[in-house]
């Protein structure tokens, strides 16, 4: 919303969600037409080995970079949660982001990622969905109680802003699940295109409204102060938001294994013929997670990670490759709706990818990692804590980092 402009941002959210819905169904249709059951094999059969290699790189990089971003979010978010524990020194190394990233990796994400069957993560996904609902409620509550006290930036309500293409990249990052779509499709009891279509339609509708609520409430609260991780904008001494941070940190930790499954599958398909022995399954999983963890320890600015992953990886996986595969495989007439939409998506995806990358490099976001905003200081504003303790709290203006959305 900060990059695109609030009205245009809402319209782009609906548009990206529609394109995502269409391309997810198109992808499975392409698999049915080609008789393939993985994204890589579909592209291999359609465009040969060069296409297979390109897709493999993209399909590995997107979830791998997502794993890095989830580690960054977990470290930043949970460190602030533990700092709120009475008697805990904020400078204690054991509540620092580096220690938390390492601990969460060893304790949760690595064991969950060692599963072989993605269907076993179903209960984990259900927990994540429940926590997301709680987080949304907290963001909405703070939009009502905190938003009116924060000054709005001068250009807060303009229809469109120059960085709208970058916003499309971030939105693509949020909606994409193409890299694991065949994994989910094959886990259905009766995998058919019709059943997949119904599942996707329902999932996308729910997702887009959750995203709109998050984006709207977050932007209405902080307007132009918004950053890449929404919780960076809230004050550290807000107990309700602290609970939200905890839920958010748990959610991204539980989402992490889904991405690891995809990176491991790509490696298995490219280097091991699609099958990993028990030993190599463990070795590959540990290696991927170790590298992702080390990189996340060196990076603490989320915004640029989301943008680059969105425009370089998510955009071709959503817009370009499914459309290109379907156009080459389908024997439907040129006037068929699927072919018309594919012809529209393909060039738009190319434009978003090229210009989004250029703009992400030339117009980098400010990243005020770990800094409190001016409205959180006692001299600027005080807000009565609405939690059960009714303790008087003060609030400061932190630059809004919206990892849910911009």
UniProtKB/Swiss-Prot annotation:
GO terms for cellular component: membrane. Coiled coil: none annotated. One of its GO terms (biological process) is amino acid transmembrane transport. It is found in: Membrane. Residues 1-7 are cytoplasmic. Glycans are attached at residues 44, 275. It is a multi-pass membrane protein. GO terms for molecular function: L-amino acid transmembrane transporter activity. Its main location: membrane. InterPro entries: AA_transpt_TM. Keywords: Amino-acid transport, Glycoprotein, Ion transport, Membrane, Sodium, Sodium transport, Transmembrane, Transmembrane helix, Transport. The chain crosses the membrane at residues 8-28, 48-68, 93-113, 121-141, 156-176, 202-222, 241-263, 279-299, 301-321, 340-360. Putative sodium-dependent amino acid/proton antiporter. Belongs to the amino acid/polyamine transporter 2 family. This is Putative sodium-coupled neutral amino acid transporter 11. The gene is SLC38A11.
């Amino acid at each position: 919303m900060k990059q695109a402009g609030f009205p245009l941002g809402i319209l782009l959210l609906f548009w990206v969600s529609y394109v995502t819905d269409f391309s997810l169904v198109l992808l499975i249709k392409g698999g049915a037409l080609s008789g393939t059951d993985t994204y890589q094999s579909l592209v291999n059969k359609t465009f040969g080995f060069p296409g297979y290699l390109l897709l493999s790189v993209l399909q590995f990089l997107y979830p791998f970079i997502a794993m890095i971003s989830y580690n960054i979010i977990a470290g930043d978010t949970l460190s602030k949660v533990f700092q709120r524990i009475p008697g805990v020194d904020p400078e204690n190394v054991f509540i620092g982001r580096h220690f938390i990233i390492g601990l969460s990796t060893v304790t949760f994400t690595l064991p969950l990622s060692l599963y072989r069957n993605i269907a076993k993560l179903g209960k984990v996904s259900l927990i994540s969905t429940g926590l997301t609902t709680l987080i949304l409620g907290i963001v909405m509550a703070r939009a009502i109680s905190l938003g009116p006290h924060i000054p709005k930036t001068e250009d807060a309500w303009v229809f469109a802003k120059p960085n709208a293409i970058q916003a499309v990249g971030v939105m693509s990052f949020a909606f994409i699940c193409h890299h694991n779509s065949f994994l989910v499709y094959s886990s259905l009891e009766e995998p058919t295109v019709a059943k997949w279509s119904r599942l996707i339609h329902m999932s996308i509708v729910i997702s887009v409204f959750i995203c709109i609520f998050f984006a709207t409430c977050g932007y209405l609260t902080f307007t132009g102060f918004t950053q890449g991780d929404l919780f960076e904008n809230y004050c550290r001494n807000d107990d309700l938001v602290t609970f939200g941070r905890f839920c958010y940190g748990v959610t991204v930790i539980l989402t992490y294994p889904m991405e690891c499954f995809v990176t491991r599958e790509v490696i298995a398909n490219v280097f091991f013929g699609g099958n990993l022995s028990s030993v190599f399954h463990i070795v590959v999983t540990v290696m991927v997670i170790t590298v992702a963890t080390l990189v996340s320890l060196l990076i603490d600015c989320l915004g640029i990670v989301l943008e680059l992953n969105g425009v370089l990886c998510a955009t071709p996986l959503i817009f370009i490759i499914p459309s290109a595969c379907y156009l080459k495989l389908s024997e439907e007439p040129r006037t068929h709706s699927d072919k018309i939409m594919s012809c529209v998506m393909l060039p738009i995806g190319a434009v978003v990818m090229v210009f989004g990358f250029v703009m992400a490099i030339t117009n980098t976001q400010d990243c005020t990692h770990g800094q409190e905003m001016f409205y959180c200081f006692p001299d600027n504003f005080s807000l009565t804590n609405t939690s059960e303790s009714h303790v008087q709290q003060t609030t400061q203006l932190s630059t809004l980092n919206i990892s849910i959305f911009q």
